[in-house]
Amino acid sequence: MAAEGPMGGSPPSRSKRADAQRNRETVLTAAAEVFVTSGVDAPIRQIAARAGVGMATIYRHFPTRADLVTAVYEHQIEACAEAGPSLLAGADSPFDALRQWIDLFVDFLVTKHGLADALQSDSDRFAALHAYFLDRLLPVCTQLLDAAVAAGDIRPGTQPYELTRGIGNLCVGRDNDPRYDPRRLIALLLQGLERPRTP
């Protein structure tokens, strides 16, 4: 028999927990969008307005701005990590899956680059976030590379860390130079990985 509270009421229902989780997801999505357009120093009220929630809801889930920035960054990492297996299952070839995943990875890097910068003053938090980034995304990149090699789509020998680090370096500076499009160079990089087809 379920335990009752001191006033004879029931414990918090699953629907309330589900509502809280939905609110959290809504806030994270809204914050990510606001951070892209207005930067990580955007007013919390702007994020609340975008999410359609009160500021108290945001502070209940994320007591400090650093908590919110970290959660947004982790949320985007998770989305990128979870996309890998789905792309591999649905793409025409493992190389196509790799290429599509790298497109998502570049989207993440280009639009969320300032989030990591905002946390560098908190060295412990930044180090933990960077470790989380590597722990979640390197295995996905490894899976995609291994599948593409096994299918004969790309040459063997490419290390996941080298590839993600190289792509990350190509994306640096995009925020400050609208004339620079890292995707063109990344497309050339991927062409270099592709194994030539025999006639």
For the regions a language model picked out, list residue spans one by one.
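Hydrophobic alpha-helical connector segments
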Residues: A71, E82-T111, F126
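Hydrophobic/aromatic residues within well-ordered alpha-helical segments
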Residues: N23, Q76, C80, P94, ...
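Amphipathic alpha-helical packing segments from all-alpha helical-bundle domains
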Residues: E78, T111, R125-D153, T158-Y180, ...
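Short amphipathic alpha-helical segment with a characteristic S/N-K-E followed by hydrophobic residues
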Residues: T64-V69, C80
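Helix-turn-helix/winged-helix DNA-binding modules
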Residues: G39-V40, R60, R155
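Short linear capping/connector segments at secondary-structure termini
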Residues: A118-F126
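Short hydrophobic/aromatic patch on the recognition helix
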Residues: G52-F62
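Basic, helix-initiating cap at the start of DNA-binding domains
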Residues: M1-D41, R45-R50, D67-T70
